[in-house]
Amino acid sequence: MPGSALLCCLLLLAGVKTSKGHSIRGDNNCTHFPVSQTHMLRELRAAFSQVKTFFQKKDQLDNILLTDSLLQDFKGYLGCQALSEMIKFYLVEVMPQAENHGPEIKEHLNSLGEKLKTLWIQLRRCHRFLPCENKSKAVEQVKNDFNKLQDKGVYKAMNEFDIFINCIEAYVTLKMKN
């Protein structure tokens, strides 16, 4: 019996050491995240600048899709979920529709989408930035308003993409301080 107990302890310690090794590698990715996050946000802004004028000209609506309540969700306890849902919203709903509005912008939108997807993957990889499961009412409101605008919704959403980048930056900056 003492031999099997010793063997169990050794296996347990080996497992703990292995899991700590994985944790350290994961944390190393997170320690460099603030620098890469700044770079990724700069790349997102640069990629968006390639299509911004196109969507500004097409957006003839006076209402705002990305309201202050969304920014408040990003800064509050629902920040994680709001960020995750908004990234998915842009990747799954907005950008595919936006690509159909002009072949001259499709390549730039693909680039913008890839950069947003890369940011999302890195946020998920570093669990402290995206550890969430709750629903954001502000995001639901954005989606409802987007759908009500029908064809014009894509112009509104893409025109306000820079506001979305600012929300991402506010969220990540807040998380880095904590």
From Swiss-Prot:
Keywords: Cytokine, Disulfide bond, Glycoprotein, Secreted, Signal. Pfam families: IL10. It comes from the Eukaryota. Its main location: secreted. Coiled coil: none annotated. GO terms for molecular function: cytokine activity; interleukin-10 receptor binding; protein dimerization activity. InterPro entries: 4_helix_cytokine-like_core (IPR009079), IL-10 (IPR000098), IL-10/19/20/24/26 (IPR020443), IL-10_CS (IPR020423). Homodimer. Interacts with IL10RA and IL10RB. Belongs to the IL-10 family. This is Interleukin-10. It comes from Rattus norvegicus. The lineage of its organism: Eukaryota, Metazoa, Chordata, Craniata, Vertebrata.
